[in-house]
Amino acid sequence: VKHVNDRIKRLRQEFFEIRPEICPERARFFTRSMQDTEGKPIILRRAQAFYDVLDQVSLFVGDDEIIVGNQASKPRSSPIYPEYSWEWLVQEFEGDPYDFNQRPADPFFYTQETKQEILELIEYWKGKTVYENLREQLPEEINLAWDLGVIDDTWVSAAGLGNIIPDFDWVLAEGLEGVIEKSRKELDSLDLTQPGAIRKKWFLEAAILSNQAVIRFSQRLAEHCQQLAQQVTDPDRKRELLLIASNCRNVPARGAQTFWEALQSTWVILLALHLEANGHAISLGRFDQYLYPFYREDIKRGRITRDKALELVEAFMIKTNEINKIRSWPDTSMFTGYHMAINLAVGGIDADGEDAVNEVSHLVVEACGDLKLFTPSVSLKVNPKTDRAFLDKALKAVQDHQGGQPAFYNDVAFMEILENMGIAKEDLYNWAPVGCIEAHIPGKWDFAAKGPWLNVLKVLELTLNGGKDPATGKQLFQTPGTLETFESAEQILEAFKEQLHHYMSQQVITEHINDALHEQVDPNAFRSSLVHDCIERGKTLIEGGSIYSADGGPTTGIISAADAIAAIEHVLFEKKLLTPAQLFRALQTNFEDENTDPTGPEIRALLLNKTPRFGNDDDRADRWAVAIADFIGSSYHNDFHNSRYGKGPVPCCYSLSQSPVTGSVAFGRAVGPTPDGRKAKDPLNNGISPSNGAEREGPTAVMNSVGKMPYIWFQKGA
């Protein structure tokens, strides 16, 4: 951090000194409001509760802050959202499996008063939450698959829906008053005699109230800064606070007039979206594109210096790290690291197909290298037209950051993927990564990633055991054959495909039920009002208000499964180094039986070191990874529709996500020993990276293997 100024050094240091806590305020104000509005339409109740939260949540402004507004009563503290789930709160307050403040990762601290208040508040929510109703509505077979680690939908059933990018361009141009005006025009034009018009009326009324809530919140911030200005003695800080107060009075109510206002407006919108519902991966889109006009005008008029603009960008980026989310421990194990997946994109091309890199792009990359923070996730869209000097600066930032940022995205490949899905050509250039690595059209798409996880290696384990879980002996979906009876690797693949398709179907059924429940109890008007064409259609995102939609949850273990099939083919069918019975016995004993010939450890060494592995540019392994990914990707795209199909958005398919976050570790615990030499409970491969320790021929060979993968299905990234 040697390149940042003193203010930024202090803000960054303060962030690292803060310990995350549990904040009861949002749960308190939200619950009280919902209790007061029983009997009214749910969308109006949630809008009123959103207003009440923003009207009452505590405000604070740090001594060095120049971008203001807070999610909870303290920085990095997490609100509680009891409308989604409550069971895990009770369990973990009692230490099952860990007390929140004693977790081995992502601890949250709390007072006894906070614990008592939350336990009292959740009494109202028992029987009303998305998660408990989903588990009650799921068929027994799906619940069993969930419990055994084949699929898992906790992340979008025990929480709100995220993975969105609102239309920041629109808000910065017209402000939320423009959103309200558009909503009122649609409301005034409704013919209430028409079927469905009443529901549209409720949505538009909720959209107006929700936007008014955010304006009111910003006005409260202005009043707070005005009061602080009267108390401080330092004249420079006094002027600063008065200017911040002026910013908050103007934005996001109206269009931004300066670069500082544009950043403040963007921050308040991002913050409000996280307070409306706690889905993560709410992202910033093409940050450099919508902020550059304000920067350019300020520089032209002499209202700002480049150094001041960099300070503002860095203060903004530090501020994003305050947004936090407490998850259940099982969910935390899949998103370890206080992971919020707030993505910020720069680069790419403009509507004319020219290089879109501008001075704000440079500021972001410099800030990324200077701050060395993990939020926001800075992403660079790399196009053949991208300026080489800018690419060199971004590569230097990667070296400085030392944590993998900025990330580099193939702009052309993602445009091809999106066009293959049916996205309009005029929108392709404007795509942006959302959340972890998913492709999204800002302001036009609903949820870039949504749906149950799929544990591909677990499905292979079931396939090799005739559909039976070897750890519990429970019989799930049965297909012909076992490891001891299959006669070829191709025969295994066909049975594997049948199993995969079955569990993909279970994913879709689960998400249809989840969507129906979210539609019933979790319609969110604010975020919907900032995505086209929700206002015109009078629908929330979950009801089909957006222009584009495609579901699909994270998939993990494709490469591990490919390695396992390649190993079976090599040692059983080609070289005949082992008999099926020998390999089966080694798996049964977790490669630990010393009394066989060869011994379990010797068999494991053979599998790890003498079989083809993905990541070595070896088609004997790579072809299986390609076949598995192609089957999953094409099946999602061609065989399934999400719940918004036929309601307005397109293409409403499912698509393949290979972004496991830390799910490769969590799902590994559900899988026994596998024929690739992996022991029980060990991690699966990460994304489309080779399995741990599998790459033998260096990084070029790894890239050659990865380059063979059928990326055309990877809308949700890899």
Model-derived segments and spans:
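Extended non-globular scaffold/tether segments
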Residues: 205-217
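Heptad-repeat amphipathic alpha-helical coiled-coil interaction surface used
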Residues: 215, 222, 226-229, 238, ...
